[in-house]
Amino acid sequence: MSNASLLSTEAAAALLKAATADGRSIAPLRDRLAIADQDSAYAVQEINTRAWLAEGRRLVGRKIGLTSLAVQAQLGVDQPDFGMLFADMAVGDGEIVAAGRLIQPKVEAEVALILGRDLTQERHTYADLIRATEYAVPSIEIVDSRIENWNIKFVDTVADNASSGLFVLGGRPVRLSDIDLTACAMEMKRGDEIVSRGNGRACLGSPLNAAIWLADMMVRCGRPLQAGDIVLTGALGPMVAVKSGDRFDVSIDGLGNVSALFA
């Protein structure tokens, strides 16, 4: 591809925004961006974040992706990534998700943290995070990709809002002092079949490690985490592709259950 035909960050953002609105996928961006690096990918994401906020979408939190070392190795990176959570991405526990809302969805079981205080320091400690966290709940992240056939590398997924789709929160808040998030076991069923298992160690050694990484990163990016924000800390086990009619039930020891249904 000639330099003249390479995409600017603005052009790449426009392609992704249109794909999101139209419910369609596009070719990978990594070989089409004029500068295909981490900074450019987050610049694309930020352009669309600002556009969506200007259109009235409400920011309610962040998601952390690539918290599995195996997935990082697959994509050739040594760190997680993040994306924005908007209010219109929330789905009620057990609510049916219409097929038309998504392109090529997959589900992941995660721990969600709800913040009660801002996290604004340059470097945060476990104590900072524990003080700032109001409670934890079980969650299902319904990831989706605007990139054809999930043919993604780091630049593609970051630009595409970290492959965000929708999310479901469970209904039983638990304080961090009442649960061991490192050892907590997770089981996901599709119908009666167990399709994913894992525990807190699968998420950067602990969901708390992932949340601290995010808190520090958000300060550097100028969008620090605030009281009331939702933080999806990353997958506790393998993600699973979704088919029409599927029902997924997730159980996380010490946190409880959460479900997602697909029309």
Curated annotation (Swiss-Prot):
Cofactor field: a divalent metal cation
GO BP term (any one): 3-phenylpropionate catabolic process
Enzyme Commission identifier(s): 4.2.1.80
Annotated GO MF terms: 2-oxopent-4-enoate hydratase activity; manganese ion binding
One Pfam assignment: FAA_hydrolase
One of the record's GO cellular component terms: cytoplasm
Highest taxon of source: Bacteria
Alphabetized InterPro entries for the sequence: Fumarylacetoacetase-like_C, Fumarylacetoacetase_C_sf, Hydratase-Decarb/MhpD_sf, Keto_pentenoate-hydratase
Catalytic activity: (S)-4-hydroxy-2-oxopentanoate = (2Z)-2-hydroxypenta-2,4-dienoate + H2O
Family: Belongs to the hydratase/decarboxylase family. MhpD subfamily.
Protein name: 2-keto-4-pentenoate hydratase 1
Organism (species): Dechloromonas aromatica (strain RCB)
Lineage: Bacteria, Pseudomonadati, Pseudomonadota, Betaproteobacteria, Rhodocyclales
